[in-house]
Amino acid sequence: MYRYKITFAYDGTNFSGFQIQPNKRTVEQTLKNAVNKIAKHPTPAIPVIGSGRTDAGVHALNQVAHFDIPYHLSNESMRKALNSILPLDILIKKAELVDNDFHARYSAHRKTYRYRVDQGEFVNPFKRNYTSHFKYPLNLEKMRKAADDLVGTHDFTSFVASGSQAKSNVRTIENITIKRDEVRNEVVFDFTGNGFLYNQVRIMVAFLLEIGSNQRPVDDVSRVLKAKDRTLARMTAPASGLYLVNVDYGTNDEKD
């Protein structure tokens, strides 16, 4: 068997998330269908293993998955073959033959997510599926100061949605940047960490927006982290503004 790592982008608007669900259009099922078509529909079907799940409406710029296939194709042939089958809202950017010990989920070292907030007076119909909307003035310095308290290793119980299957809510956030995109009239958040809990990024964004709009004090992060109480960070930002930007494996896994 030959193991391939694929790096791909998708528009999450018309997907019910990444993970396979009965009678739902998902990214995982769509990829699985394409891979099994290339492999001439073996039994049992070939699974596609992603680096992690994204929810309905969440996008990806560089999601990663792997699969094992009984036929050898060059990297470029595999990329082109998949793209010839896949719908237009998924694009395979790179296909790589890798060692069999590579695992899209367990080999990952860190991930980066981006969240885009449109600051227009009204919702832009052409951006509504790709940003969230917050028209009120935001103090970026206050949000940056608060974000510093999220960086590091913490128990993020207050920032995880119900339904999480994680065994531990301890995660490490390495970096958070908050910038204003003057051209697009957006505020852009980037979060890099060793992994993120269910809805964690969207909850943190909503929390920081409350601080930036003076609905919370700047030092509220520490209090809420220590409390380990989800009701203290009650809001969740919409899925439409969230993007998986990068999955870092720390090494070059591609085989010659």
Curated annotation (Swiss-Prot):
Transmembrane segment boundaries: none
Catalytic site: D55
Residues given in the record as substrate binding sites: Y113
Enzyme class: isomerase
Catalytic activity: uridine(38/39/40) in tRNA = pseudouridine(38/39/40) in tRNA
Matching InterPro entries: PsdUridine_synth_cat_dom_sf (IPR020103), PsdUridine_synth_TruA (IPR001406), PsdUridine_synth_TruA_a/b_dom (IPR020097), PsdUridine_synth_TruA_C (IPR020095), TruA/RsuA/RluB/E/F_N (IPR020094)
EC number: 5.4.99.12
Protein name as catalogued: tRNA pseudouridine synthase A
Organism: Limosilactobacillus reuteri (strain DSM 20016) (Lactobacillus reuteri)
